[in-house]
């Protein structure tokens, strides 16, 4: 017997609006305020690590990571390792970037790293397919949508809030599944 219930996933997906979603105004979305505050555990989207490494994460994100319990997904590890594989070994900045990514992954506390289960993976694939159809996503955007859906549903199942700068995609996910939670920030320009 599979750990994934196909029929239950289809019943779950009845929320399909059968129409393209519109990005909501920032004022309607949960953004980090100027001051970090306590709250639910957070699950970090891959962009949080990347923005931190590139010096583009606002200071309030670092404060938030100090105040709240931060959790990591194997999805983020996978995306970070994909970046390592994509980097040109001949580029002069690659060695330093790979080293920074390695330190970032090694700094993740093992008891705070979570892998999605078959139910999350199956439902995320279904949700991602719906999102791609509704929004007309193609090629690269489809894989990104799948990873975002896995992270979003994983956070929901674990009772976490996704911390992300990916406002558009996670806004769509919040519209489809309002019981999920995301907290947004805007990456700053690199100095």
Where are these regions (language model features)?
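Short, well-structured N-terminal submotif of metal-dependent ribonuclease cores
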Residues: 1-79, 84-102
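Acidic, PIN/NYN-like endoribonuclease modules and their adjacent C-terminal/linker elements
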Residues: 1-33, 152, 156-191
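Active-site neighborhoods of divalent-metal-dependent phosphate/nucleic-acid chemistry enzymes
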Residues: 2-9, 21, 27-29, 84, ...
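Short beta-strand scaffold positions
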Residues: 44, 72, 115, 146, ...
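Alpha-helix capping/helix-boundary segments
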Residues: 48-49, 120, 151, 168-170
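Phosphate- and divalent-cation-binding pockets in alpha/beta enzyme and binding domains
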Residues: 79, 123, 172-173
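Short, hinge-like loop/turn segments at secondary-structure boundaries
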Residues: 87-92, 132, 180-183
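Acidic, glycine-rich loop-and-strand cores that form catalytic or ligand-binding grooves
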Residues: 104-108
